[in-house]
């Protein structure tokens, strides 16, 4: 465990743009740099044509490609539209919405929920991650993402008649470190050099604001197939600065589909007495019909779902013939739409802005076309959202612009993105020492000096956390490592410099160095499980809800740490000069040390303690020790006449 050295200041600095690790270590782009929107439901690819981004059509003539991969009984692998076409007859081996699993552990609540909502198998890999199974083979979500990225790569190569090796790939703004690393890995799997992972709402803002010169504050509301993000950006004179970001990594069109599927299945069961829940082929037919109905209800007030021969019983074949109105659907998904409101308010608050400061609201993602969603956005921001960009294509176009920036084709554009959650380490008493606050512009590199919590300590464990609470037990552990080989020394003497380094992809490296020996250790936090939407929402909500009590608990622990140091120092001095002091005085001070230590141990264990009692006992010990040693040094000075300073 580490203890913070409060007398030493934090060292905070940011890399110059030209020297970010992502730029310096990535291979120089050869040939065109494409921009890929790797979406939950659909993906798209774009490239710069001169100063303008252009969406490239796939071999089927579509400007977007379904993010679906299927494995047929003949051993063929299908990607995109061909995979979607055969999903009804091959539901168990057709994998869709797999982006929701990327960078997640099998035990995550979202994964467990998805297991019951999809016709294919989600399995637990040996490392604890969520993987997929098709035709007896297991695949990581990164592999499936890689197959889709490869389809985008092939689309670009066919359109450009050139070999493509480099890409900028987008991800949700609220993706954590593991999910970002997994997105890069998906490209690596298919031999694609992912130069940068860029946040989806930021990419959309690039597409919207490339030609704008005047200063504007823009809110990007991005409700896609699987995730929801909102970002507030300041755009002007070629500078795109993200002020704040918020969102939910498990909220999107898939959830709207699931709600409608459940409604149809329940209605059919009520009418016929037949439960279709376990009939994978029937559920896949209903899912496709539900998605189609959802899209139609954005432009019509009602639609019909007709599915003949959905099943059969002793009385003969059964059919689904159900009319759904827009009002019914809106009522059905109202709880999902309401989940977008709070993140918007928090993003504005974090940016230090009010709705009147926002010049434009940009809608991104297929679900942002739903009239009720548009109405909700209007009520949040108090203005009509802009219809200046295509919600399905803006993200890929923005990624292409970022590719153009990296390739040197787009000049005078600077993109300043942020990290979505605070980062820090655990110090003595379980205190969260925050090194990088949420919404800090990236790339960022910050250092702070810490020390040992016990005498003779030769190693320290660095536990890295992500979250907004004052104590680590309330935040998310995302990695840990050990720095060994520290020379034995008194408690608090070694100087250990801990450095957090976030690159332009938002991927975190944490290092620790003993300044005396220059021994160091580090970790790139890439194997952590994904933060659930509930965890992220709870982190930010709890941080606000418990701000005062957290602050009080932190102050109590920090005060207890200082009191503990006083106990140690006083005890050491007693042992050194015990023979010169009366046994009665020594015993009195020792009793006070014991009483104070009992309170200190409770505080350091996170138990509730009275700050007044802690303060009182500390002052009593301090005063008693001062009087005791004052007399000692006074007597010593009179008897010896020495001018020697007392020992530390």
UniProtKB/Swiss-Prot annotation:
GO terms for biological process: chaperone cofactor-dependent protein refolding; iron-sulfur cluster assembly; protein refolding. Gene3D superfamilies: 1.20.1270.10, 3.30.420.40, Actin, Chain A, domain 4, Substrate Binding Domain Of DNAk, Chain A, domain 1. It is found in: Mitochondrion matrix. SUPFAM superfamilies: Actin-like ATPase domain (SSF53067), Heat shock protein 70kD (HSP70), peptide-binding domain (SSF100920). Residues 1-23 form a transit peptide. Required for the translocation of transit peptide-containing proteins from the inner membrane into the mitochondrial matrix in an ATP-dependent manner. Constitutes the ATP-driven core of the motor and binds the precursor preprotein. Has antigenic properties. Elicits a specific immune response in systemic candidiasis human patients undergoing malignant hematological disorders. This is Heat shock protein SSC1, mitochondrial. The lineage of its organism: Eukaryota, Fungi, Dikarya, Ascomycota, Saccharomycotina. The gene is SSC1.
